[in-house]
Amino acid sequence: MTQEKRSLHKTPPDGGWGWMIVIGCFFVTVCTRAVTRCISIFFVEFQSYFAQDYARTAWIHSIVDCSTMLCAPIGSYVSNHFSCQVGIILGGVLASTGLVLSSFATSLEYLYLTLGVLTGLGFALCYSPAIAMVGKYFEKRKALAYGIAMSGSGIGTFILAPVVQLLIEQFSWRGALLILGGFVSNLCVCGALMRPISLKEDSLHYPLKREPQLDSSCSPLCQDCSHKKLCYCTTKEYHFLLKPKFIILAVSFLFLAYGCSPPFVYLVPYSLSVGVSHQEAAFLMSILGIVDIVGNITFGWVTDRRFLKKHRYCCYLIAVGLDGLCCLFLPILTCFQLLVPFSVMFGYFDGAYVALIPVITGDVVGTSNLSSALGVVFFLHAVPYLLSPPIAGWLVDTTGDYTAAFLLSGFSMIFCSILLGLAKIINRIKKNPQATVVRSSDIKQEVWTNGDVSCLNAIS
C-alpha cells in the first residue's frame, strides 16, 4: 500500500531531496571505488608477506573490480524489483564482512574469495543502484549532480590513500583491513538515504510492473497470460540492448575498462621501482584523487551549460583519448617531480569521463532504463577489469619493466576514443544524404494533367 501512494512526478525534481541522494551516492562512491583503488596500496604488502609474483598478487585487485562489475546486473535487479535501499544496505553488510574476514587471511587464495568475491559482490549491490537514483532526481543539472556524486571516488582516494598507508605502518595490513571493514559498513547509512521516487516516464514504460500476482488456484490460461506479460516486461526492460548507439558504446567500454585499470594498480609499485619513497608514492595517489574531484565537478558543470549540452558525447571521447595519451608518457617519467604532473593530468581526465559515463548512457537509453543499462555497462567492465592487471603483471614479470604494460593501457583507451569518434562521424554522414533528399523534395515539380500545369509542394 505504501508503494501505491508514492507521489508520481512528471519530471525529475532537480533538487529537494535529490541533493540528499547526491550526498548518499557521494559516500557510496567513497566506500566502493575509493576503497577499491586503495587496495593497490596493499599490493607490496601482500606480495612480500605471501612471497608471490606480480601476476598472482594482481589477481586480488582484478577480482574485486571484476566482481563489482560482473554482479552489477544483480544490483540493478534488486533495485528494480525491491528497492535501492534494500540493495545498498545488503551490499554494505556483505562488503564490510568481506574486508573483516580478509584481515584473517592465510593465503592469496583466501583473499581472492573474501577481499575479491565477497567484497566485490557487496560493492556491486551498492554502486549501480546509487548512481541510477541520481539520474531519477535530476535532469537539467544531471551532469553537475553526477560530477558531485562521482567525485567521492577522488575525494575518498585523496583522504584514504595516506590514511591506509599510515594504518598499514601502525597496525600492519591486517589491522588496516579490519578498520576499512568498519568504515565500509557506513554504506548501510547511505542506503537509508535513498528515498524511492516514481516518474511518469517509468509508469509509461513499465505499466505492468505492479500488477498483483495471480493465485496458484487460477486457471492455466490465466497463469499463461501472466507469464507472457512478465516476459514482455522483462523484454521491455532491456530493449535498449538492440540500439546501435548502445552497442557501439558497449564495445567502447570493453577497451576503456582494459586501459584504465592498470595505471591505478601499478602506479604505486612503479613509483617505488624508480626510487620514490612509500609516502611519496601514496601521495601520488592522493594527488590523483584530489584532481579527479576537480575533473568530476568542473567537467560536469561545464557540460551542463547550454552551449555544450549537445556535445557531451564529444567531450567524453576527448577526455578518454587524453587519459590514454597520459599513459603513453608514463614509462619515461622516472622521478617524483615528473610523476606529479602525470597524476594531475591522468586524474583530471579520469574524473572528467567517469562523471559523464552515466550521463552519456542515460542520453542513449533514457532515464527509465538507466538502472538496467548501468548494470549492463558495469557488467561489460568485468572481464577487462579481471584480465588487465594480471596481463600487465605478466608483462612486467616477462620484460622486467612497466613500459609494455602502460603502453598497452594507453593504446586501449585511445582506441576507445577513436571508435566513438568514428561512430559519430559515420552517424553524421548517414544523416546528410537524408537531409539532401528532403531539401531537393522542396523544389516545385510540374505535373501535366489534361493540359493543365499543377504545382505540388512536397510535404516534409
Curated annotation (Swiss-Prot):
Annotated TM spans: 11-31, 58-78, 86-106, 115-135, 148-168, 177-197, 246-266, 282-302, 329-349, 354-374, 376-396, 406-426
Highest taxon listed in the record's lineage: Eukaryota
Location in or out of the cell: Cell membrane; Basolateral cell membrane
Keyword Membrane among UniProt keywords: yes
Family note: Belongs to the major facilitator superfamily. Monocarboxylate porter (TC 2.A.1.13) family.
Gene Ontology cellular-component annotations: basolateral plasma membrane; plasma membrane
Record protein name field: Monocarboxylate transporter 12
PANTHER family: MONOCARBOXYLATE TRANSPORTER (PTHR11360), MONOCARBOXYLATE TRANSPORTER 12 (PTHR11360:SF318)
Organism listed in the record: Xenopus laevis
Leader sequence residues: none
